[in-house]
């Protein structure tokens, strides 16, 4: 994609997976199951900050942008678009594409990628 459009690729850590470095590996699955069931108001502050940073970055994109990311980042964005009370909205299919159209920092329309319950162990 970068070669086709003669663009450089860079990694923006804003779109890193949900912060969980302080959670023991053996407890991460249960932790994530709990997180996706929570109301956004009940989420740990670091998750709230993570989600706000992601959506802010999306809304302030100044040009056409392609973001490759994890399913929880995609869920965070879509849950904000849908004004959901949960950070978890759907199971994006592998290689699904969600499109967001902005005008002057405002979402004017969006298309959610294919939803498929993939094997995520949740």
Residue ranges and their predicted role:
Residues 1-122:
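Terminal low-complexity/intrinsically disordered segments and their adjoining alpha-helical capping regions
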């Amino acid at each position: 994609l970068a070669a086709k459009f003669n663009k450089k690729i860079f990694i923006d850590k804003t779109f890193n997976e949900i912060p969980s470095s302080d959670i023991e590996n053996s407890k991460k699955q249960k932790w994530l199951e709990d997180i996706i069931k929570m109301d956004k108001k009940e989420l740990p502050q670091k998750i709230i900050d993570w989600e706000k940073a992601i959506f802010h970055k999306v809304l302030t994109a100044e040009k056409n942008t392609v973001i490759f990311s994890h399913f929880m980042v995609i869920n965070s964005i879509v849950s904000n678009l849908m004004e959901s009370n949960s950070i978890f909205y759907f199971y994006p299919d592998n290689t699904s594409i969600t499109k967001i159209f902005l005008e002057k920092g405002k979402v004017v329309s969006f298309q959610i990628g294919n939803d498929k319950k993939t094997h995520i162990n949740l």
